[in-house]
């Protein structure tokens, strides 16, 4: 099994292996196999479109968790310039599961904040698997307040399996840190654009998710709980995660239908990890368009629209 491909993608992986083998044979034996390779590549593209046209909610969750999926730093490096990371919550510690700092988007100053996961074992431990402790949320709020002081817009990138549930986090008042962020973000007199780029799970996502616009990548998910957590509670078995994912309505299409997100950003064929540069360029265009629109509004209009927007959730 090719680990770069998920279980439902294995037919694609097998065809890609044949393409790679043909290329190797053509190169090593100096045979022109271009026509055969092109035919197989077209067949592979058709197969990929067929599989991805009918994904289940659980398969989308798998894509959101793909180990090669772009993380916050991948987008920062491609979308923004002059990024200057800011550290610490000024209360307890640095909190590496959330990163943030000043940057420029097409020359305009912005404050970028997002969850960061790791790729290697050491990075995953350092980033706490993208699960923020209270100091992470407090750091994020400190940076947002700093941005407000200088009238700089805030852009958040959400990608977390949830807030860290450890004893230490609870002792340092995890729930208060999340609630404080919700309260304060609702009142910031600057534009806030939130984008779910991967996992958007529970309070850990919402703690940097209160804004004027909520964007979502096509194969990300946004939910009050993970499918496995929901299945363990309702069915006493994580094996029911597929049913839970469907019931939670956590996909971008379903959330857009419910009016809980504003835009769905299409991903490259096969997911964002298949072409990170193209995905970043598309995200950049959406961020710039929304930022231009929001910057034309007064602070009072931003607050009024934000208030009405969040008050309307769940009414229909």
From Swiss-Prot:
Domain CoA carboxyltransferase C-terminal positions:
39-293
Subcellular location, record wording: Cytoplasm
The chemistry this enzyme catalyses reads: N(6)-carboxybiotinyl-L-lysyl-[protein] + acetyl-CoA = N(6)-biotinyl-L-lysyl-[protein] + malonyl-CoA
| A GO molecular function held by the record | acetyl-CoA carboxylase activity
Q: Which domain of life is it from?
A: Bacteria
Q: In which pathway does it act?
A: Lipid metabolism; malonyl-CoA biosynthesis; malonyl-CoA from acetyl-CoA: step 1/1
Annotated Gene Ontology cellular components are:
acetyl-CoA carboxylase complex
**InterPro entries named in the record:** Acetyl_CoA_COase_a_su, ClpP/crotonase-like_dom_sf, COA_CT_C
Give the EC number: 2.1.3.15
Q: Which GO terms describe its biological process?
A: fatty acid biosynthetic process; malonyl-CoA biosynthetic process
Query: Quaternary state and partners of this protein?
Result: Acetyl-CoA carboxylase is a heterohexamer composed of biotin carboxyl carrier protein (AccB), biotin carboxylase (AccC) and two subunits each of ACCase subunit alpha (AccA) and ACCase subunit beta (AccD).
Tell me the NCBIfam families matching this sequence: accA (TIGR00513), AccA_sub (NF041504), PRK05724.1 (NF004344)
Name the family the entry cites.
Answer: Belongs to the AccA family.
Protein role: Component of the acetyl coenzyme A carboxylase (ACC) complex. First, biotin carboxylase catalyzes the carboxylation of biotin on its carrier protein (BCCP) and then the CO(2) group is transferred by the carboxyltransferase to acetyl-CoA to form malonyl-CoA.
Protein name (record): Acetyl-coenzyme A carboxylase carboxyl transferase subunit alpha
Q: Which organism is it from?
A: Coxiella burnetii (strain RSA 331 / Henzerling II)
- Name of encoding gene: accA
């Amino acid at each position: 099994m090719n680990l770069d491909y998920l279980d439902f993608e294995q037919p694609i992986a097998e065809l890609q292996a044949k393409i790679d083998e043909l290329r190797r044979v053509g190169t090593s034996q100096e045979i022109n196999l271009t026509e055969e390779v092109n035919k197989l590549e077209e067949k592979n593209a058709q197969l990929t479109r067929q599989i991805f046209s009918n994904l289940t909610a659980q398969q989308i969750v798998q894509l959101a968790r793909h180990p090669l999926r772009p993380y916050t730093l991948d987008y920062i490096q491609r979308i923004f310039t002059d990024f200057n990371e800011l550290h610490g919550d000024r209360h307890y510690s640095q909190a590496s599961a959330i990163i943030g700092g000043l940057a420029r988007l097409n020359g305009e100053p912005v404050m970028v904040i997002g969850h960061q996961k790791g790729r290697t074992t050491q990075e995953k431990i350092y980033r706490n698997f993208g699960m923020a402790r209270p100091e992470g949320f407090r750091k994020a709020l400190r940076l947002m307040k700093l941005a407000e002081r200088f009238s700089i817009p805030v852009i958040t990138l959400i990608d977390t399996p949830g807030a860290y549930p450890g004893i230490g986090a609870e002792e340092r008042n995890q729930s208060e840190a999340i609630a404080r962020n919700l309260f304060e973000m609702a009142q910031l007199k600057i534009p806030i654009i939130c984008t779910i780029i991967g996992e958007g799970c529970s309070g850990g996502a919402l703690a940097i998710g209160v804004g004027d616009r909520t964007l979502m990548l096509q194969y990300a998910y946004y939910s009050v709980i993970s499918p496995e957590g929901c299945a363990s509670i309702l069915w006493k078995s994580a094996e029911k995660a597929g049913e839970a994912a469907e019931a939670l309505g956590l996909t971008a299409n379903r959330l857009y239908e419910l009016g809980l997100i504003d835009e769905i950003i299409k991903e490259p064929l096969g997911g964002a990890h298949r072409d990170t540069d193209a995905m970043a360029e598309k995200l950049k265009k959406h961020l710039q368009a929304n930022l231009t629109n929001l910057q034309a509004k007064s602070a009072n209009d931003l607050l009024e629209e934000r208030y009405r927007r969040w008050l309307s959730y769940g009414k229909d």
